[in-house]
From Swiss-Prot:
Cross-referenced InterPro entries: ArchSynthase1/Queuine_TRR (IPR050076), TGT (IPR004803), TGT-like_sf (IPR036511), tRNA_ribo_trans-like (IPR002616)
Cofactor list: Zn(2+)
Annotated spans, RNA binding: 249-255, 273-277
A cellular component term, taken from the record's GO annotations: cytosol
Top-rank taxon: Bacteria
Protein name: Queuine tRNA-ribosyltransferase
UniProt: Zn(2+) binding residues: 306, 308, 311, 337
Keyword terms: Glycosyltransferase, Metal-binding, Queuosine biosynthesis, Transferase, tRNA processing, Zinc
Its job: Catalyzes the base-exchange of a guanine (G) residue with the queuine precursor 7-aminomethyl-7-deazaguanine (PreQ1) at position 34 (anticodon wobble position) in tRNAs with GU(N) anticodons (tRNA-Asp, -Asn, -His and -Tyr). Catalysis occurs through a double-displacement mechanism. The nucleophile active site attacks the C1' of nucleotide 34 to detach the guanine base from the RNA, forming a covalent enzyme-RNA intermediate. The proton acceptor active site deprotonates the incoming PreQ1, allowing a nucleophilic attack on the C1' of the ribose to form the product.
Length: 374
C-alpha cells in the first residue's frame, strides 16, 4: 500500500472475525467498520455537504458511469476535481461503472476489449474499457478507485459466471497497468456469483497482486439473503487482514452485521436516501412509513435518542405532513436521519468491537430475520 494510504486494525472480536480499524487516505481517516453514503452524481440526493458532514459521514461514494455521462469528467476536472467540484473535503470513492453498465442487459455488448452500450440518456454509442474506466477515475480524482469488472447477473449458470470471473481478473491486470496516480488507491473486486469455489479462486488470485484494498462485488443482485450471507462469510476471510475490505452495494442492518462478523470494513448503499424519498424512516432496526395515519398526530421526534437535525428539531407529525404533501424538505430531513442512523449503527458496532462486546450486543442480528416494519 502507498505511504499515503494505510490500514490499521485496532481490535478484533474474540468470537467472530469482526474488527475495528482506521483507513488513512489523502483526504482524512475513515474509522471502520463504516457505512458510506452514495452520491451518484457528485451529490447525496437532497443533502448538502455540510449536512452530510453533520451525519457523521466520513467517506462518500460517487459513480464513474453516471459522471461520465453527465456532466463529463472534463467538467469535473475543470471544477478542480471531484472533491472541490462537489464541495466535499473528506475521503471519496468512485466505482468503476461496471455494475451500471452490466445492468443495461438489453443495451450492451461484452467483448474481451470492454463493453459497448447505448447511452440511456441520448442513445449515443459508448465504449467502456478497463483503461477508459481508470482514465475517467484518474481524472475525477477520488481517493479510492475501483477496477472495471464484469458483474454476472443472478441467476446465471456456472459457465457464464466462470467466464465473467476470469475476464474480471484479466481486466484488473489492465486496470493496474493503466492506473497513473499514486494518490489514488486502486481496489480489486472479487466476483464469482453464488459459486463459492469460484469466489475462493478469485479471492486467492487477486490477493497475489497486492493491491491497496479489496472489494466483494456481485452481491445483492437478486440472490436470496442467506445465499449472500454464505458468499460474504466464505470470501471475506480470504482477503488480506492488513488491507481494507469493502462489500459493495449493501446497507441494511442485518446485512452489515453479518458482513462485519465476517471481517468486512466498508459498505455503501442507496437505501437510506431512496427510502427517505418514499417517506420511510430507519429507526433502530425498523422501517417506519411516515405516511401511516398513526404518525399524523405523533409529536415526538422520529427517534428521541438520535442527535440528527431532523430529530432534534421536528416531530413525526410534521415530517408525516411534509411526506403527504410531497414537500422536498421531507426527503431532506428523512435522508439526514436515515444516513445518521446507519452511520451511528456502524459506530456502535465499532465501539462494541473495541470493548469485545460485539456478539453480546449485536449477535441477535446473526440469527434473526430483518425486523418487521412498524
Amino acid at each position: 500500500m502507498s505511504a499515503i494510504f494505510s490500514f490499521q486494525s485496532l481490535a478484533r472480536c474474540s468470537q467472530t472475525k469482526a474488527r475495528s480499524g482506521i483507513f488513512l487516505t489523502p483526504h482524512g481517516i475513515v474509522e471502520t467498520p463504516r457505512f458510506m453514503p452514495v452520491g451518484t452524481l457528485a451529490n447525496v440526493k437532497t443533502v448538502t455537504p455540510a449536512q452530510l458532514k453533520e451525519t457523521g459521514a466520513q467517506m462518500v461514494l460517487s459513480n464513474t458511469y453516471h459522471l461520465h455521462l453527465q456532466p463529463g469528467e472534463a467538467i469535473v476536472a475543470g471544477g478542480g476535481g471531484l472533491h472541490k467540484f462537489m464541495g466535499w473535503n473528506g475521503p471519496m470513492l468512485t466505482d468503476s461503472g461496471g455494475f451500471q453498465v452490466f445492468s443495461l442487459s438489453e443495451m450492451r455488448k461484452i467483448t474481451e476489449e470492454g463493453v459497448t452500450f447505448r447511452s440511456p440518456r441520448d442513445g449515443q454509442i459508448i465504449k467502456l474499457t478497463p483503461e477508459r474506466s481508470i482514465e475517467i477515475q484518474n481524472i475525477l480524482g477520488a481517493d479510492v478507485i475501483m477496477a472495471f469488472d464484469e458483474c454476472p447477473p443472478y441467476p446465471a449458470n456456472r459457465q457464464e459466471v466462470e467466464a465473467a470471473t476470469e475476464r474480471t481478473y484479466r481486466w484488473l491486470e489492465r486496470c493496474i497497468t493503466a492506473h497513473q496516480r499514486q494518490d489514488q488507491a486502486l481496489f480489486g473486486i472479487v466476483q464469482g456469483g453464488v459459486y463459492l469455489d469460484l469466489r475462493a479462486k478469485a479471492a486467492n488470485t487477486l490477493t497475489e497482486l497486492d493491491l491497496p484494498g479489496y472489494a466483494i462485488g456481485g452481491v445483492s443482485v437478486g440472490e436470496p439473503p442467506e445465499m449472500m450471507a454464505q458468499i460474504v462469510q466464505a470470501t471475506a476471510p480470504l482477503l488480506p487482514a492488513h488491507k481494507p475490505r469493502y462489500l459493495m452495494g449493501v446497507g441494511t442492518y442485518r446485512e452489515m452485521v453479518i458482513a462485519i462478523a465476517s471481517g468486512i470494513d466498508l459498505f455503501d448503499c442507496v437505501i437510506p436516501t431512496r427510502w427517505a424519498r418514499h417517506g420511510t424512516a430507519m429507526v433502530k432496526g425498523e422501517r417506519w412509513n411516515l405516511k401511516n395515519a398513526k404518525f399524523r398526530e405523533d409529536f415526538a421526534p422520529i427517534d428521541e435518542t438520535c442527535p440528527c437535525y431532523a430529530c432534534q428539531n421536528f416531530s413525526r407529525a410534521y415530517i408525516s405532513h411534509l411526506v403527504r404533501s410531497q414537500e422536498i424538505l421531507a426527503y431532506t430531513l428523512l435522508s439526514i436521519h436515515n444516513i445518521t442512523e446507519l452511520i451511528r449503527f456502524t459506530q456502535k458496532i465499532r465501539e462494541a468491537i473495541l470493548s469485545d462486546r460485539f456478539l453480546e450486543e449485536f449477535g441477535h442480528w446473526l440469527n434473526s430475520a430483518e425486523t418487521d416494519n412498524r
